[in-house]
């Protein structure tokens, strides 16, 4: 299993190819465009760990921006007892959803996301015989 720990938005994320993650809004990137995360703190490739000091040089995590969205609403309610003072406010954090495509070290991809055509199983129409092929009428089944 290959994974990397990257830093984005002041937070650290454990990322794996083929998975998507929600990070704080990346305003400078448009939807469905590639984005490189260059602040890689650690890479684990088949048990071999590469640790940065603080970042791994020549390491890049390639991602694609799937969408910009807003998170769930969080209600903030402030109340001072016995004073009839109440404030109810809501907050929705702006987020960006990233799909991790590959983890690269020194320009060599260590792991890539499986393509969608490989992951989708093919339908086999011959797997289940129809009623006409078996000779049993549909009423008796």
Swiss-Prot record:
GO biological process, one term: translation
Cellular component, GO, one term: cytoplasm
Residue ranges, annotated region (Disordered): 111-141
Molecular-function GO term, any one: rRNA binding
Superkingdom to which the source organism belongs: Bacteria
UniProt xrefs under InterPro entries: bL21-like, bL21-like_sf, Ribosomal_bL21, Ribosomal_bL21_CS
Protein name: Large ribosomal subunit protein bL21
Subunit relationships: Part of the 50S ribosomal subunit. Contacts protein L20.
Pfam families assigned to the protein according to its UniProt record, in alphabetical order: Ribosomal_L21p
Keyword set, alphabetical order: Ribonucleoprotein, Ribosomal protein, RNA-binding, rRNA-binding
Record function comment: This protein binds to 23S rRNA in the presence of protein L20.
Family: Belongs to the bacterial ribosomal protein bL21 family.
Compositionally skewed regions (Low complexity) per UniProt: 118-133
């Amino acid at each position: 299993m290959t994974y990397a720990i990257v830093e984005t938005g002041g937070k650290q994320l454990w990322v794996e190819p083929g998975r998507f993650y929600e990070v704080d809004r990346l305003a400078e990137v448009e939807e469905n465009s590639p984005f490189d995360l260059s602040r890689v703190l650690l890479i684990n490739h088949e048990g071999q760990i590469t640790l940065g000091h603080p970042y791994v040089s020549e390491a890049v995590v390639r991602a694609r921006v799937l969408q910009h969205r807003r998170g769930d609403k969080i209600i903030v309610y402030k109340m001072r007892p016995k004073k009839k003072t109440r404030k109810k406010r809501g907050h929705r954090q702006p987020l960006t959803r990233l799909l991790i495509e590959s983890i690269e070290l020194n320009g060599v991809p260590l792991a890539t996301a499986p393509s969608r055509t490989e992951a989708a199983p093919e339908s086999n129409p011959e797997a289940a015989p129809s009623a006409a092929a078996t000779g049993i009428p549909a009423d008796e089944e």
